[in-house]
Structure formats: C-alpha cells, structure tokens
C-alpha cells in the first residue's frame, strides 16, 4: 500500500515526529492533544458530516446547564466514530445501541439525542417516539437526525434492486456499518442475499 502503515491508538501514543492520516470516522480530542505533544503532523480525513456532528455535541456539552441533561448517542459502543463523539463530552455521553436500551434513560432529566452517522433511520425514529412518550413534561427533549444521507438515500434503490433479482451478492467489509445497514435492507426484501468481502467467498 505504497508504504502506508495502519496503526492503533496505543501505537499512535508512542509515535514522535511522524505524519499520520486520520480516517473518515473522526477522533476524540485526546488524539489531537497527543499529536501536538509528540510533534505528529495530522492529515485529517475526517468526514465533514462527522466533524459537524462532533462540534454540535461539544457545543451542547459545554453549555452551563449540562449537569441537568443527558447527551445520548444512538450508535455502536466502541465504534470509531462513536468514540470520537463521546470524547467531545469527556466520556459523559450515554451510548444506546437499540430501542431497548433507551428504556434505561432518566426521563426526569432533559435529553439531547444524536445519532452515529451510519445508523438506521427507522430505528432512530422509533427511539425518538419512545422518548417523546416517556419523558417528563417538566424537562426538554431535543433530537438531531444526524444520519448521513449518502447511506439513507440509497435504501429505496437498494430495496428495489434486491427485489428485482433472484440472487444478490453484496460486497462489503464485514465490519462496515454502512455495509451492514444496506445489506440488511437487501436481506429484508430478498432472503437470497449474501454478504461477501473477498474473492474466495
């Protein structure tokens, strides 16, 4: 790969006087602090949609009333993008992966709900409705649909495509959130859909 080496956070922390490309998922503030301290030149390829979301969450978090509200992120625990988002709140944001987990929120406190950019719009809307139904009228609930339309807008087309073919091979990395969402849409309309990520498969 033309001399490009992939590193993890542990290896990044030990680097000095190097040049590092950050991938699209975004990074928590600590990564940039480490880069300055260790004289690491950052080439920031963070997706602009993710960057805007990080800023939005940080602004919400630094407001004076943040003790009285919950910042909630609908996303996958441990996902690179989610780690970057939670990092904007010094680890205070609550991450929920599915509707079931929304039931454990404190509905006597205000809630600000955001979403990982690559999550399911349908599930996000169900979570919004659930919170609306259960939150106390004495507090406020604001939600921000921060799901990337590059993925969401493809869903109607991919459903149509999968329904019009007998067999679908969906080529994607097995860990890709975008890939999983789009493949699941194929599978819903055509059970004879298969996720593959290599020529061997």
Name each model-derived stretch.
Residues 1-201:
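The feature marks the mature, well-folded catalytic cores of soluble enzymes
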């Amino acid at each position: 790969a033309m001399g490009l080496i992939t590193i993890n956070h542990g290896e990044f922390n030990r680097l000095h006087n190097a040049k590092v490309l950050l991938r699209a998922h975004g990074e928590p503030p600590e990564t940039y602090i480490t880069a300055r301290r260790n004289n690491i030149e950052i080439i920031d390829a963070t997706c602009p949609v993710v960057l805007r979301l990080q800023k939005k969450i940080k602004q919400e978090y630094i407001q004076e009333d943040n003790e009285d509200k919950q910042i909630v992120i609908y996303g996958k625990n441990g996902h690179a993008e989610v780690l970057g988002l939670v990092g904007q709140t010094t680890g205070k944001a609550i991450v929920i992966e599915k509707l079931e987990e929304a039931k454990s929120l404190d509905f006597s406190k205000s809630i600000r709900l955001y979403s990982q950019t690559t999550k399911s719009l349908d599930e996000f809307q169900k979570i919004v409705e659930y919170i609306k139904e259960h939150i106390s009228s004495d507090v406020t609930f604001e939600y921000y649909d921060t799901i990337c339309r590059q993925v969401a807008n493809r869903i109607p087309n991919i459903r149509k495509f999968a329904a019009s073919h007998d067999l679908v091979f969906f080529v994607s990395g097995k860990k890709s959130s975008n890939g999983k969402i789009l493949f699941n849409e194929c599978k819903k309309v055509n059970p004879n859909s298969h996720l593959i990520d290599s020529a061997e498969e």
